[in-house]
């Protein structure tokens, strides 16, 4: 049986996505019919990974203001848009049967443009799902 070629793409900014990868990578590596590669976007913070990444991308990072919300002006100027587009163009997603994505932008856009199967496992994907709980609109008196 031909092994499943799986690319696991992780957002490396912050510890949450990397912590999930620490739990999932050993489980995926234990599967006999899976060939796993890992890519990371952003800067790893405080936590290591159980597998050496095939690629590291600068990716895309949000900048936050003093009130805690996204500072769109700083976000726009802090990112290298040409580097991001180049990374998307060069991402090796076509070499894989499936891409498992944890809020990693480079492979997400590369898969979208090339119509490669992708599964999004981030919390953000869960709250976007049609079956997820929705905020109720307040009643007007």
What residue spans do the PLM features occupy?
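Conserved nucleotide-sugar phosphate-binding/catalytic loop shared by glycosyltransferases and other
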Residues: 3-4, 8-15, 30, 34-83
């Amino acid at each position: 049986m031909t092994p499943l070629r799986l690319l696991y793409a992780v957002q490396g900014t912050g510890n949450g996505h990397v912590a999930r990868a620490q739990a999932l990578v050993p489980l995926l590596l234990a599967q006999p019919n899976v060939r796993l590669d890992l890519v990371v976007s952003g800067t790893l913070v405080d936590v290591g990974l159980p597998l050496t990444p095939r690629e590291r991308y600068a990716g895309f990072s949000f900048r936050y203001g003093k009130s805690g919300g996204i500072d769109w002006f700083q976000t726009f100027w802090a990112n290298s848009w040409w580097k991001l587009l180049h990374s998307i163009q060069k991402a090796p997603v076509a070499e894989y049967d499936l891409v498992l994505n944890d809020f990693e932008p480079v492979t997400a856009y590369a898969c979208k443009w090339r119509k490669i199967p992708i599964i999004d496992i981030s919390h953000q994907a869960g709250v976007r799902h049609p079956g997820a709980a929705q905020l109720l609109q307040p009643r007007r008196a």
